[in-house]
Amino acid sequence: MSMSRLGLLLFVAILLVLLQSSTCLISSPSSIINPSKVKQVSSKPRAFVYEGFLTDLECDHLISLAKENLQRSAVADNDNGESQVSDVRTSSGTFISKGKDPIVSGIEDKLSTWTFLPKENGEDLQVLRYEHGQKYDAHFDYFHDKVNIARGGHRIATVLLYLSNVTKGGETVFPDAQEFSRRSLSENKDDLSDCAKKGIAVKPKKGNALLFFNLQQDAIPDPFSLHGGCPVIEGEKWSATKWIHVDSFDKILTHDGNCTDVNESCERWAVLGECGKNPEYMVGTPEIPGNCRRSCKAC
């Protein structure tokens, strides 16, 4: 083989290695998750802030995708689960599908890696804009109705991605939370709005992410997870919400009467007595079938 041909092959091999390395840096979640940037801010609920989770490019990209499709935000009715406009939530927003483009897919990968929760358990990202005076009153992210819980179960966790800085206001506040004992009290309370001083608060900072769990470790809804978005006093707030369920949210619901198990762990859970301990999830009702009807001998 001539030296020129050998040199060409070597050049191509090196180029492929460089391209593969670059791809890993962009798309491999494990290469960009840095645990040292995470700090716990609350023990009840379990809440954590990841500093610099998103790049400026990722933040700006999500905003640009959302700008043309913003609509008035809605809330879920506690009785029937239907979405409705309410003064409780005055922002505007839109959903962005998980596979919208490579940047969005990369963000989804990072979220799954950080939370240790499958991508299919998450809803699409909801990008929100809060203008002057707009807010989201204190609420829970787990469900009170049986309609929404039928698809993927409760929301086990929420991640709030802060896409912009806010001059004043716009904090996320947990009114009933218990502060983490080893938390660094570097946050200057004087910089917080009056709303944020009513509990443990996280200031919106571009690129940061807030993860908190809506369920306790025994899967019971956590009353300490009550949280709200304080009114924006100066500036404009952009954020993105990722709600993550205990089961697959992408799964298509069927009511064809087939006696099946949705989760591969159903048989083991049934042996452990979960059919009686957690009948809503395992067995369900005639209107909303559970996820482990076969193993629970409910059909």
Swiss-Prot record:
Disulfide partners: 259-299, 266-292, 275-296
Membrane topology, as annotated: Single-pass type II membrane protein
Keyword check for Metal-binding: yes
The ShKT domain, residue ranges: 259-299
Keywords for the protein's UniProt record, in alphabetical order: Dioxygenase, Disulfide bond, Endoplasmic reticulum, Glycoprotein, Golgi apparatus, Iron, Membrane, Metal-binding, Oxidoreductase, Signal-anchor, Transmembrane, Transmembrane helix
Residues holding Fe cation: 139, 141, 227
Segments on the Cytoplasmic face: 1-5
Disruption phenotype: Reduced root hair length and content of hydroxyproline in root cell walls.
Spans traversing the lipid bilayer: 6-26
Keyword Cell inner membrane among UniProt keywords: no
Places the protein is found: Endoplasmic reticulum membrane; Golgi apparatus membrane
Membership in a protein family: Belongs to the P4HA family.
Protein name: Prolyl 4-hydroxylase 2
Native source species: Arabidopsis thaliana
